């Protein structure tokens, strides 16, 4: 039970959150769920409560999850060798079966169950359900020694999104459900494709013209060359940071995904620290936030 001082603190926090609740009621927020937030028990529970809270105050949260470490664990237990090219898991037919078992099965249903235990009404699905996410094989190339025509590398069932059925998501959100999406797409021939979860989240946000795209990470946010978190950026500033090499390496694909979403109609993208309990609520309902905000400033003038 709260004492009087703590009760006053809670009341003050709720009062400060009210303008944000009013502003975002009825809006759609797409959250890419991954990193430590998916493995730490306290963070898993705080994330589930955050998502339920959003729904209760009138926001439409949509969760897209990863599961790379869980896939790696099962492949190891099954003695299936796994390799990566350009950061992408080479996914032959045997590996794809494991990817579907992990992403569409255990990981997806664990998230659904956790949200439901906290009072939500979550429904899990993959892109194969009702052909919800269509995909094609991702073409990966690398330079050849003579620097002529690049070599095409076959990395198996790794795909890129070609389409997202908006009607499937709106059917669920209109029924007060919380969609929980595993990043598996289906090709024209019915083949399954393993797709990067950041890319799926970005495309879903674009199709829905979402208010926000939130990418949970294991870092404090996008940092400058001095290691300081950059809290607010325009798309033009992000382009400049990519050009001068400030954004590089493993963070580059994530930032490019967020940048593309904002340039294609999403109101804002957020790179947030998923290691912080209730990170999503802090980012939405407080002035301070817990990461980097990328806004559409300048997009509409281009």
From Swiss-Prot:
GO terms for biological process: arginine biosynthetic process via ornithine; L-arginine biosynthetic process. Substrate binds at residues 67-68, 89, 194. Keywords: Amino-acid biosynthesis, Arginine biosynthesis, ATP-binding, Cytoplasm, Kinase, Nucleotide-binding, Transferase. Pathway: Amino-acid biosynthesis; L-arginine biosynthesis; N(2)-acetyl-L-ornithine from L-glutamate: step 2/4. It is found in: Cytoplasm. It catalyses: N-acetyl-L-glutamate + ATP = N-acetyl-L-glutamyl 5-phosphate + ADP. Its main location: cytoplasm. Its EC number is 2.7.2.8. InterPro entries: AceGlu_kinase-like_sf (IPR036393), AcgluKinase_fam (IPR004662), ArgB (IPR037528), Asp/Glu/Uridylate_kinase (IPR001048), Glu/AcGlu_kinase (IPR001057), NAGK-C (IPR041727). The record marks 32, 254 as: Transition state stabilizer. Transmembrane segments: none annotated. It is an enzyme of class 2 (transferase). It holds the Pfam family AA_kinase. CDD domains: AAK_NAGK-C. Disulfide bonds: none annotated. GO terms for molecular function: acetylglutamate kinase activity; ATP binding. PANTHER family: N-ACETYLGLUTAMATE SYNTHASE (PTHR23342), N-ACETYLGLUTAMATE SYNTHASE, MITOCHONDRIAL (PTHR23342:SF0). NCBIfam families: argB. Catalyzes the ATP-dependent phosphorylation of N-acetyl-L-glutamate. Belongs to the acetylglutamate kinase family. ArgB subfamily. This is Acetylglutamate kinase. It comes from Hahella chejuensis (strain KCTC 2396). The lineage of its organism: Bacteria, Pseudomonadati, Pseudomonadota, Gammaproteobacteria, Oceanospirillales. The gene is argB.
